[in-house]
Amino acid sequence: MRIVLDASGGDHAPQATVAGAIAAARTWGDQIILVGDEASIRAELAKHDTSNLDLPVVNAPEMIEMTEHPAQAIRRKRNSSVAIGLRLVRDGEADAFVSAGHSGATMAGALFILGRIRGIERPCLVTHFPTVHGHALLLDSGATTDCKPEYLVQFAQMGNVYAQKIVNIAMPRIGLLANGEEANKGDKLVQDTHVLLQQRSDLTFIGNVEPKDMLINGSADVVVADGFVGNLVLKFGEGVFKMITTAASNNIKAEWRKNLVLGLLPALVALTLPGKGRWRALIAGLTGLTLPASMAVAPLLALRKRMDYRSHGGAPLLGVNGIAIVAHGKSDALAIQNAIGQARNAVEQRVVATISHALETVELVPSA
C-alpha cells in the first residue's frame, strides 16, 4: 500500500510527521511517501533508523501558509506538498493522502484535484466524536460551512453508508443537530433540512438532537450539521474534555499532596512504636491517606485515552473521488501514525467505491 504524507504540514512538522511515518512503515510495512521540503525531511530521517523501510521523499518547494486563502493557494502553488500529494493519488501513484497542515487547503485541493463522487454536491468531514456510550459520527465537522438543506441530506446519506459499511452499524440512527428536539427548532437551514430528512425512506431519521443528547444519551449514531456548527461543536468539545481532565488531574495532585502532608505526623508517631509495629503503622497510615487519590488516577487516564483525538488520527473527507485524511494541526508522531492507519483502513475497506456504489442504489437529493 502507498500512503502519501504531507511531511511539511502541521505544528510539529517535520519532526512529528517523519517519526509518525517511520512508526507506520515499521508497523504495517507500507510505502509512506514523504512530500515536502526535501532538505528538512532528509535531515530528520537521518536521525532515525530507517533500514528496510520504504520512505521515498518527493520535494515540494512551495509552502501553503496558514494565513492563505485555501482555494487561491491551491491554484497558485501547484508545487506545494498538498497539491503534489493529491496529484499522486489522482494519478494512481498513491492510494491515499494524509495531512496535518492547512486543513482548508487540503479540502479545497481534494475537491479540485480529486473531484467529487458523482451526484455529490459538497464534501464533508466525518469525525468520531466521543460519547458516554462510545462514539457518534459527526458530519460535517468543517469542510463545507455555507450549506443548503440538500447538502445536509447528502451528508446524512454518506454518513449512513459510512456507518453501515465502515463502522458496521446495520441501521444507523440519523440525528440533526439543533437547539431543541422539536421540529420547529433551529434556523431556517435546520428546519428545512428536517423536512427533507423526514421524507427519506432510505434513512432512519430520529429527528433533532441536542448536543447534550449526542454526548450523554447516545440517541444518534450519525449526527448531521453544517460545517460551521459541526466544527464549533468539535472544538468546544475538545476544550471541555481538556478542561475536565486538567481540573481533575490538578485536584488529584492537590489532594495527594495534602494527604501526604497530613500523614507525616502519624508517621512520625509510628516511628516511636517498638519493634516491627512501627513499620506496619507507618505503611498503613501513609497508604490510607494517599490511596483514595491514587485510586482516581486510573479512571482519569482511561478518560483521557478515550477522549484523545490521537487515537483516531484524523477525519476522512467524504464525497471526493479519492481518500484524503485531514489530521489535527497539533498532531504528534502517534497521531500521524494513527492517521496513516486510518488512511490504510479506508483503502482496505474501499471507502470511496463503497460509498459511490451504495449511493447509486438510493435517490440522491439534488441541489435546488
Swiss-Prot record:
A GO MF label: phosphate:acyl-[acyl carrier protein] acyltransferase activity
Keyword set, alphabetical order: Cytoplasm, Lipid biosynthesis, Lipid metabolism, Phospholipid biosynthesis, Phospholipid metabolism, Transferase
Coiled coil: none
Listed Pfam families: FA_synthesis
GO cellular component: cytoplasm
Key word Lipid biosynthesis present: yes
GO biological process, one term: phospholipid biosynthetic process
Pathway annotation from the record: Lipid metabolism; phospholipid metabolism
EC annotation from Swiss-Prot or TrEMBL: 2.3.1.274
The protein's enzyme class: transferase
Subcellular location: Cytoplasm
InterPro entries: FA_synthesis (IPR003664), Phospholipid_synth_PlsX-like (IPR012281)
Substrates-to-products reaction catalysed: a fatty acyl-[ACP] + phosphate = an acyl phosphate + holo-[ACP]
Subunit and partners: Homodimer. Probably interacts with PlsY.
Membership in a protein family: Belongs to the PlsX family.
Function as written in the Swiss-Prot or TrEMBL entry: Catalyzes the reversible formation of acyl-phosphate (acyl-PO(4)) from acyl-[acyl-carrier-protein] (acyl-ACP). This enzyme utilizes acyl-ACP as fatty acyl donor, but not acyl-CoA.
Protein's recorded name: Phosphate acyltransferase
Protein's organism: Herpetosiphon aurantiacus (strain ATCC 23779 / DSM 785 / 114-95)
Gene: plsX
